């Protein structure tokens, strides 16, 4: 398990500044000496991590969902990206459309869900002044307001917001 956490961190490495040839050499050595031929094991490890996360943090339809670790959350999207990157050596999720792994509408759903979930998570952190992942009842109302949701004649803003949340979480579940 720890080995695959480290592999995932290494998978995310990128050149920021310094010696570009050294960064290229690191990347080449990682792919040739560490990642090559281990895709099946990496996928199994990531799927097991997901299963354990879902057991611990619950289903997407929990009334107070975990936006990061829960089913249909950000970690599910990240896991899909990491698997794609490991198997196909992609740099962007959009590359999966060109590889015929995703249809363009699935890529669009991925992007919209990722943008929405990150916006929710950032609002949660901002409003609570700390890193918090559980979207509690009280926080749901505040996040809905902060994200511009308004009451309609038939429904409260928080209900509309949570319906959007569950719609995105369901799409993430469908994609992953």
Indicate residue ranges for each PLM-predicted region:
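A nucleotide- and high-energy phosphate-metabolite-utilizing enzyme signature
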Residues: 1-176
């Amino acid at each position: 398990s720890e080995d695959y956490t480290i592999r995932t961190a290494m998978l995310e490495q990128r050149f920021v500044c310094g010696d570009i040839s050294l960064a290229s050499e690191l990347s080449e050595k990682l792919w040739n000496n560490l990642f090559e031929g281990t895709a099946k094991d990496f996928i199994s490890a990531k799927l097991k991590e997901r299963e354990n996360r879902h057991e611990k943090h619950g289903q997407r339809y929990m009334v107070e969902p975990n936006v990061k670790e829960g089913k249909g959350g950000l970690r599910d999207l990240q896991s899909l990206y990491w698997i794609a990157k490991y198997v196909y050596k992609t740099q962007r999720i959009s590359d999966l459309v060109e590889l015929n792994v995703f249809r363009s509408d699935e890529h669009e759903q991925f992007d919209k869900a990722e943008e929405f979930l990150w916006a929710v998570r950032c609002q949660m952190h901002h409003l609570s002044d700390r890193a918090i992942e559980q979207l509690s009842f009280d926080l749901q109302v505040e996040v809905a307001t902060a994200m511009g949701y308004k009451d309609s004649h038939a429904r409260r803003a928080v209900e509309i917001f949570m319906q959007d949340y569950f719609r995105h979480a369901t799409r993430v579940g469908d994609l992953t």
